């Protein structure tokens, strides 16, 4: 299912989330199962199915990574069940450095500074990757779309690192 069509939005990585939220509320009002309380069993089932589609679509489109995955899937590149890893050795080396820094936080003289430095580093890298992705994901060229897929994989790694950083931060306080 094309969630952009469901929400009457143009397929775009850069999405106005306020418009998305408004369309979500409109669709929910139209298909919510409570509106079909006195309807036939079939209509009730359809309302539940439509509500599930609207919820899935909203959750997919509101998050940049899942939105990018959806856009790629619409172009024939399915990342949802893959085990392909990033092959960019520079990125992998950077990731190893970040993981080492994460492991050393508790032993630092100033863990707050180390955490702040990692937050800043992650944010800058994520911003760069996201900007590149926004440029490439609209392409119709297979090679450019594969580059976009690699950028999505990198963003997934960054999400995992961010979660690890937050756990490390929570463990200190």
Swiss-Prot record:
InterPro entries the UniProt entry points to: DnaJ_domain, HscB, HscB_C_sf, HscB_oligo_C, J_dom_sf
Function summary: Co-chaperone involved in the maturation of iron-sulfur cluster-containing proteins. Seems to help targeting proteins to be folded toward HscA.
Organism: Shewanella loihica (strain ATCC BAA-1088 / PV-4)
Keyword Isomerase: no
Phylogenetic classification of the source organism: Bacteria, Pseudomonadati, Pseudomonadota, Gammaproteobacteria, Alteromonadales
Protein name: Co-chaperone protein HscB homolog
Subunit-level organization: Interacts with HscA and stimulates its ATPase activity.
PANTHER family in the cross-refs: IRON-SULFUR CLUSTER CO-CHAPERONE PROTEIN HSCB
Swiss-Prot/TrEMBL keywords: Chaperone
GO biological-process terms attached to the record: [2Fe-2S] cluster assembly; protein complex oligomerization; protein folding
UniProt GO MF annotations: ATPase activator activity; protein-folding chaperone binding
Boundaries of every J domain copy: 2-74
Xref: Pfam families: HSCB_C
Cellular component GO terms, alphabetical: iron-sulfur cluster transfer complex
Family statement: Belongs to the HscB family.
Keyword Signal: no
């Amino acid at each position: 299912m094309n969630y952009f069509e469901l929400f009457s939005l143009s397929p775009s990585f850069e999405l106005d989330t306020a418009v998305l939220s408004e369309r979500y509320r409109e669709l929910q009002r139209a298909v919510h199962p409570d509106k079909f309380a006195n309807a036939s069993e079939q209509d009730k089932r359809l309302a539940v199915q439509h509500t599930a589609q609207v919820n899935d679509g909203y959750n997919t489109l509101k998050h940049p990574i899942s939105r990018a995955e959806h856009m790629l899937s619409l172009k024939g590149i399915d990342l949802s069940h893959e085990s392909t890893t990033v092959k960019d050795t520079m990125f992998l080396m950077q990731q190893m450095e970040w993981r080492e820094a994460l492991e050393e936080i508790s032993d630092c003289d100033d863990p707050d500074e180390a955490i702040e430095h990692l937050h800043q580093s992650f944010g800058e890298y994520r911003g760069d990757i996201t900007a590149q992705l926004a440029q490439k994901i609209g392409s119709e060229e297979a090679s450019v779309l594969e580059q976009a897929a690699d950028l999505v994989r990198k963003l997934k790694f960054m999400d995992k690192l961010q979660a690890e950083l937050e756990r490390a931060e929570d463990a200190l306080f």
